[in-house]
């Protein structure tokens, strides 16, 4: 036991710890007295180089007088804490409170590069092509629903709209003329409406006919006639048929005259 105590007592004569807490948490290099102006000058030199590069690039894109020349741009540091900078000609002397804001605004007003402008133009062209394609598809659908003459070339958009207006007016006139003929007591309104295809007569037209020399054309007519009255009957009717006219001939009406038309045969589905 005494031997053990003697060994423990010998620890008191052990030298100080291998490292001090201050040495462990503190860098020896930081103990050296450094001048704050040295750090400030290094930062100012770094910023001056960056801004000189920026103004050198901006001078190529801009020719305005409000941009400083990169060669005449200089920084000066002082112990007052400010960061004044000035141009060689004295035209860009700014107060310390407006330095950062002015630089940011000039960066925002910088012109886009050629690559960015090319991308914007390509995107605008794609949007315009899609818009025109949608318009062309809509006109193709409209042409497919309007009875037209066998033109040598496709109708233009203006002619297509004129034909559509004439056809809609014709259908509206047919509906309005048929309303007084309806019997309110009959149930013909509940019957399905049918579109009947009408053809010109098979007789040879005379030279006095307005359609002499033209091929027979198909028109469209609407019928709400009660089919019960037409059972077991061979009915031949004539009706006003809308014949598509050339929209480029403005002196002609899109409505055909019933007196000048040959008899029309209505093929009724009995």
UniProtKB/Swiss-Prot annotation:
One GO BP annotation of this record: generation of neurons
Q: Which GO terms describe its cellular component?
A: cytoplasm; nucleus; transcription regulator complex
**Would you say which domain of life the source belongs to?**
Eukaryota
What keywords appear on the UniProt entry?
A: DNA-binding, Nucleus, Transcription, Transcription regulation
- SUPFAM superfamilies, A to Z: HLH, helix-loop-helix DNA-binding domain
Task: Tell me the function of this protein.
Answer: Transcription factor implicated in the cell fate determination in various organs. Binds to the E-box consensus sequence 5'-CANNTG-3'. Acts together with pdx1 to induce the pancreatic lineage within the endoderm. Plays a central role in directing the differentiation of retinal progenitors towards horizontal and amacrine fates.
Q: What is this protein called?
A: Pancreas transcription factor 1 subunit alpha
Species of provenance = Xenopus laevis
